[in-house]
């Protein structure tokens, strides 16, 4: 394999200067998603976008199935009688709920699920009898509905979240439930690593935890414009839901005890993060494992008389790749130039492009172009499959490395409010000394003009032996670092 063109990746200026405008452009031009559906916050997945989504869903299923989770499917309707049982939950969600206001004869009030804790608990109560039925781990990938009043954005802030994976687990005690929380965090790390996403893991502050949770752990990625995007959450719910739904089990000692529960969710936001993180002004780069087409083959010939010279080697190449289990597509469109096809498939994020022209036929070789760096290599046909496998692995590693390098360069510490404000304006995530007091934390948010992501779980959260003061409450000694950022 011989390098014949050095790296010359596309610029990212347009992406960074107006990320949402760029994202709309990508979704439209790459034929991923259509935003023109006439309901605010509800959009259409187009065939190519749906193929990407299915690959991500299969990844999610794989890591849940491998860890003892079982897939279920619950109705979209939740009786208000159930929804209203957990006081903090209804307080947190009632303003976002879509109500079923009509439907045949007037009957009980129904809501369209915003999340399914209150739908699942009444059924779990019927399924669990004694300690032998625990732990119980189920998940579903469904639509959930939230009446967003803020500005909606495709895949990022929706009224219908159509790829909502929610897992719900039930345990005998707090210790086992918190072990499940740790496992859920590991599952999400594996999913996001496969998507080549970099992430911060934060314990959300009390004022921003999931409604009805004892605590919430969140995964946040930082987009190229410096704003954070929440891409996954894990909640320890304690006995908050099992108390009100009377979910108990008979223990081995013959006593009846309350079960403990967890829940954790991920949605199409993760796909948005993947497309944007690996995006540039030419389109995006899909991680090879998740790309519907891993290799596109472009025949290069001029005039119909050259086609019979080139096409046999093109088809041989495609067959070799197919037989090796590589997802390959040959673009044989005669009404499009090779240059147009290069642009088109770069836009759609296909990781590798194979070019075969008349000179390549004479040498029994092909030219491989990487989407991430636009480097080109000349490879003999006999070595092509091995070269493609090697380059796909290299593309994946480069996407992951690049994402982590960019994220790590954005996290800074600030021991002064003005320094913190300046860092936020530069698109940084700022770690600020905090006493742990909720009122002081909320005041820090206001002073800095950013949102609190919480305390870091992927780094040392303690300020250690430093004599630092809470930046909003100077009379208090700081104990923790509080992360803040601008946020989608």
Swiss-Prot record:
Major enzyme class: ligase
CDD domains per record: ProRS_anticodon_zinc, ProRS_core_arch_euk
UniProt keywords, alphabetically: Aminoacyl-tRNA synthetase, ATP-binding, Cytoplasm, Ligase, Nucleotide-binding, Protein biosynthesis
Lineage top rank: taxon: Archaea
Record carries keyword Protein biosynthesis: yes
GO cellular component terms, A-Z: cytoplasm
Keyword Nucleotide-binding: yes
UniProt-listed Enzyme Commission number(s): 6.1.1.15
GO terms under biological process: prolyl-tRNA aminoacylation
Reaction catalysis annotation: tRNA(Pro) + L-proline + ATP = L-prolyl-tRNA(Pro) + AMP + diphosphate
Signal peptide: none
Domain comment (free text): Consists of three domains: the N-terminal catalytic domain, the anticodon-binding domain and the C-terminal extension.
Function: Catalyzes the attachment of proline to tRNA(Pro) in a two-step reaction: proline is first activated by ATP to form Pro-AMP and then transferred to the acceptor end of tRNA(Pro).
NCBIfam families: proS_fam_I
Subunit comment: Homodimer.
Protein name as annotated: Proline--tRNA ligase
Organism for this UniProt entry: Pyrobaculum aerophilum (strain ATCC 51768 / DSM 7523 / JCM 9630 / CIP 104966 / NBRC 100827 / IM2)
The organism's taxonomic lineage, starting at the top: Archaea, Thermoproteota, Thermoprotei, Thermoproteales, Thermoproteaceae
